[in-house]
């Protein structure tokens, strides 16, 4: 099995690149809002514990399946030890199945991400982003409070790509990932 982490800042294009990568491989996409949105809808608020538990069930069952692999998108704060621990936790679920891991970090400046924050695809797939003012404010606050871009050389993983995707189409990025990692 193959497991592709697509990491990066808010609205950098993780889900969209993941959608395109899924189209050209046998990988299945599990973008982070696939658990966030139902929890918000059902509970009327964000509930991190429930979201984590839902992800755990999906990861455990998928790892034990006969599927080719998974793409998982995750907004990672590289300055938070708990984020690194979470990546390791997810890996531990899949490691007993001989999974190969790949890591893609997408990078784009804030102005590009603010423009992408209101894209049709994003708003269609992430209802919680439809209050654009709140969503933009959250993005700006996250930029102030967290470092969601790695430093050069900081990421210790094998099979790691760092892609500045400001001026690249999602299809182009997905094709590059597929070719580079032989997915």
Predicted regions located by residue number:
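Glycine-rich phosphate-binding loop used to anchor ATP phosphates in small-molecule kinases
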Residues: 50-105
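Small-molecule kinase domains that catalyze NTP-dependent phosphoryl transfer to phosphate-bearing small molecules
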Residues: 123-173
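Conserved phosphate-donor/acceptor-positioning beta-strand/loop module used by diverse small-molecule
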Residues: 95-117, 163
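P-loop (Walker A) phosphate-binding loop of NTP-binding proteins
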Residues: 9
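Walker A/P-loop
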Residues: 15
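Conserved substrate/cofactor phosphate-moiety recognition/catalytic segment
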Residues: 19-63
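ATP-binding Walker
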Residues: 12
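Hydrophobic anchor at the beta1->P-loop junction of P-loop NTPases
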Residues: 6
């Amino acid at each position: 099995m193959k497991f592709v982490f697509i990491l990066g800042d808010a609205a950098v294009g993780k889900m969209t690149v993941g959608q395109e990568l899924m189209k050209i491989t046998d990988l299945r996409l599990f973008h982070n809002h696939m658990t966030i949105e139902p929890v918000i809808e059902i509970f009327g608020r964000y509930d991190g514990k429930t979201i984590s538990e839902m992800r755990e069930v999906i990861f455990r069952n998928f790892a034990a399946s006969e599927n080719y692999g998974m793409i998982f998108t995750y907004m990672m704060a590289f300055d938070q030890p708990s984020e690194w621990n979470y990546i390791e936790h997810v890996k531990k679920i899949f490691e007993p199945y001989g999974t190969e891991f790949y890591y893609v970090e997408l990078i784009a400046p804030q102005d590009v991400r603010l423009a992408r924050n209101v894209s049709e695809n994003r708003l269609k797939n992430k209802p919680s982003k439809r209050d654009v003012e709140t969503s933009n404010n959250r993005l700006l606050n996250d930029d102030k409070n967290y470092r969601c871009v790695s430093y050069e050389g900081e990421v210790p993983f094998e099979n790691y790509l760092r892609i500045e995707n400001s001026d690249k189409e999602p299809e182009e990025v997905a094709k590059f990932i597929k070719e580079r990692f032989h997915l």
